[in-house]
Amino acid sequence: MQVLPPGRTGGPSRLFIMRPVATTLLMVAILLAGIIGYRFLPVSALPEVDYPTIQVVTLYPGASPDVVTSAITAPLERQFGQMSGLKQMSSQSSGGASVVTLQFQLTLPLDVAEQEVQAAINAATNLLPSDLPNPPVYSKVNPADPPIMTLAVTSSAIPMTQVEDMVETRVAQKISQVSGVGLVTLAGGQRPAVRVKLNAQAIAALGLTSETVRTAITSANVNSAKGSLDGPARAVTLSANDQMQSAEDYRRLIIAYQNGAPIRLGDVASVEQGAENSWLGAWANQQRAIVMNVQRQPGANIIDTADSIRQMLPQLTESLPKSVKVQVLSDRTTNIRASVRDTQFELMLAIALVVMIIYLFLRNVPATIIPGVAVPLSLVGTFAVMVFLDFSINNLTLMALTIATGFVVDDAIVVIENISRYIEKGEKPLAAALKGAGEIGFTIISLTFSLIAVLIPLLFMGDIVGRLFREFAVTLAVAILISAVVSLTLTPMMCARMLSHESLRKQNRFSRASERFFERVIAVYGRWLSRVLNHPWLTLGVALSTLALSIILWVFIPKGFFPIQDNGIIQGTLQAPQSVSFASMAERQRQVASIILKDPAVESLTSFVGVDGTNPALNSARLQINLKPLDERDDRVQTVISRLQQAVDGVPGVALYLQPTQDLTIDTTVSRTQYQFTLQANSLEALSTWVPPLLSRLQAQPQLADVSSDWQDKGLAAYIKVDRDSASRLGISMADVDNALYNAFGQRLISTIYTQANQYRVVLEQDTEATPGLAALDNIRLTSSDGGIVPLTAIATVEQRFTPLSVNHLDQFPVTTISFNVPDNYSLGEAVDAILAAEQSLDFPTDIRTQFQGSSLAFQSALGSTVWLVVAAVVAMYIVLGVLYESFIHPITILSTLPTAGVGALLALWLAGSELDVIAIIGIILLIGIVKKNAIMMIDFALAAEREQGMPPREAIYQACLLRFRPILMTTLAALLGALPLMLSTGVGAELRRPLGIGMVGGLMLSQVLTLFTTPVIYLLFDRLSLHLKRRFPRQEEEA
């Protein structure tokens, strides 16, 4: 019969050791909860941390940027500026379109923001032009967020106007109804319309004006209430043929009579079915297409949204004619799924490596099975808590679980090693489990809570970076906490049932060889440790030098914000001279497209030319380049971008700007390159003075690449200067002049054709093919007060001037954005420093305000808080350790291990050519929590030896180091191998995972070597200091 230790032996583990059935069932419950939770967890690339963002688009065809700014954007901005919770408001006013982007505070629900935006639009309605074709339309979408899915609709048999009509009514509306979809845009602008092209000479010969034609059309095509007849027996609804539906109907329309003969519209104009806007076009590869871009709502799960669209597509395409082909050209979820799969594989690999290292040290199958059960149980149990907290399976949470693999096994290893030690001394398994678990319980609690304490500052990081890493920190903390519970319950219970003196003594050739090897290693370590303890000041000097080296490396290592990911999609902007026409721009775009499609890494391409809510100017073309899957191409995205830019450099008159799409989108504007810097002023004149010199200086900086500005003030404008006195004498008002010009050159939407499914427009313009350019103004005719026809040139002169192609505002003030990339041999930190130096050298006046935007602004914010984040982690850990040890001194001894981890991590990043970005900083903070466990295990046993066996401090710490050498080495290697798959990652999303693995592997390798020697030395030095203080202040010590 086994003699059990006293009832108090075993600590918190005693109940679970003595009740194996209850313990087993409790663990099964945790396992089942985790498995069920996993099935309900959504999948995404990163935690959902989007700012609530709403875009408001107002179209005013034919209006110049100045008119759009003053008549539409400014009234809207004044109302939007009064909304509570608004973080930033930016706007872009271009020819015919106003786009206002509203970014709200993270804490404001998107639905609340939507209500405020709608109220502001309603308040501004009376201030907007009365002839707006449509009121402002808002969408819950961030315009800078790349589409989650891009579809191309093509047909070789049906006109594109009919294709767009079918897509808009049958496909786009249904996709818009999918939960999570924020906006569906149809690039290509081929909405059906009846186009009326006036023949200026024919109208003039008949003594008519364009205003006469416009009035006749609007009066002839109406759709209004007519009432009903209600008689004694029945009611009759009234209707009439007041609607004209086809181009032929309009062609036969009588617009005037002369000498008793009718003048029909077809006599003075060509009337045909066409597109509502003839200056828009989209292409899929090199085929004319309607390109459908689907963007998600901020905060919506991208995987769920894309899956819903995929399920719906077959049914939607069945409703289209067979000649209409719908092709999915890009789906961001493909790379997201691949990235998550790669991370899941690395997680499984980490578990396998950790179990392998356990067997290598324990050399016993039953002893290996125990932590082999504890690791997956701790990780799977975490899924249940993640569901409760509304987390998702994403790259960061999977990275947390991968790193946790090395953490969670530590507790089980420490418990097993301690229980095995007593069994090898001859204790019975049950007694050894009670005694070993009770002895190690405080160490497990210290390890767990001190490690969780390191993660606490991550929960208080501000802004979007804090939200981003909250899931990472909480997931890791939960896994560590569950691991501690498992290690104090299931692990000792399994040790009591599965381990025995015979099983531990049973050895094969490998076991005997490895045992001899470890004994020799421990003996060598013991000899070196004795020498180190005899030279404490030299060792202390080494420890202090690591602290100094950490500070030096921290200052000089290149710094970045977030790794640039290879998601297989490149966003591009093609820039041409500011006065380029639509036809010329379309031709240049086709030349560039043919070059891009020849690249072996490119799978498909979509491009768009024209001005609408997504493209600000006619001299810009938008491109989306879809690359082949990573395993089907030889080069990463940055290499492909460099190659494409070099190839396009040979095309005259264009500049191509490219940037890879990212899962993390902080910007609210679509810029040409990755990072933005803004200049804001009180007037456009101030910007025109200071933008060119700053731009030229930045373009000369080697730390910057692809520097460009959205400041475009060299667009050609015809300024019509009316002699108001002459016009007034003839009875011609400025409204008459504006109407005549708008009728001729504005693609004016003058009437609406209503059908059961949709509404179509009648577009009025002047045929300028015979008289292109400024000569077309000679054909403009006005009606005087006496009914005479007056040429515009009789009362006005025309001057050619330059004008901005668009007017941009930031928080209601004029702004220009300078975009830039960072060359491969420089970091974002160096680029930011170069921009700030260039700014200081120019000595801007006080009315010029500068600011980084988007990722570069977040980088500045994160860089400023990084040092405080590390300090907060150290302070939090000191407080927890001080409370646990009831000592001011011992926590300092434990924390003395931290500089070695910092040196190792920073050196590894520097040697690997990686930047110190937020991912790497998280790794360093985790190292703070990991490396101190070596000191905790040493100090716990040294203090116990001093207290219970009366050993002197030197002998106690020496024996503790030798006794704990094997579990220290085992746990460190387990943590290192847990991070190794991340460091060696090569698949999709590897850019995100690799910095974390590099920093942790480097830090663990160096700290493992140094802390085995520096910790005992510092322990003895602080012990001497403590004794000195006790002798110096005995009364205070007694009172304490």
Swiss-Prot record:
GO terms for cellular component: plasma membrane. InterPro entries: AcrB_DN_DC_subdom, Acrflvin-R, Multidrug-R_MdtB. The keyword Transmembrane applies. GO terms for molecular function: xenobiotic transmembrane transporter activity. Keywords: Cell inner membrane, Cell membrane, Membrane, Transmembrane, Transmembrane helix, Transport. The chain crosses the membrane at residues 16-36, 342-362, 369-389, 396-416, 440-460, 472-492, 537-557, 863-883, 888-908, 911-931, 968-988, 998-1018. SUPFAM superfamilies: Multidrug efflux transporter AcrB pore domain, PN1, PN2, PC1 and PC2 subdomains, Multidrug efflux transporter AcrB TolC docking domain, DN and DC subdomains, Multidrug efflux transporter AcrB transmembrane domain. Disulfide bonds: none annotated. Its main location: membrane. It comes from the Bacteria. It is a multi-pass membrane protein. It is found in: Cell inner membrane. Belongs to the resistance-nodulation-cell division (RND) (TC 2.A.6) family. MdtB subfamily. NCBIfam families: PRK10503.1, RND_permease_2. Part of a tripartite efflux system composed of MdtA, MdtB and MdtC. MdtB forms a heteromultimer with MdtC. This is Multidrug resistance protein MdtB. The gene is mdtB.
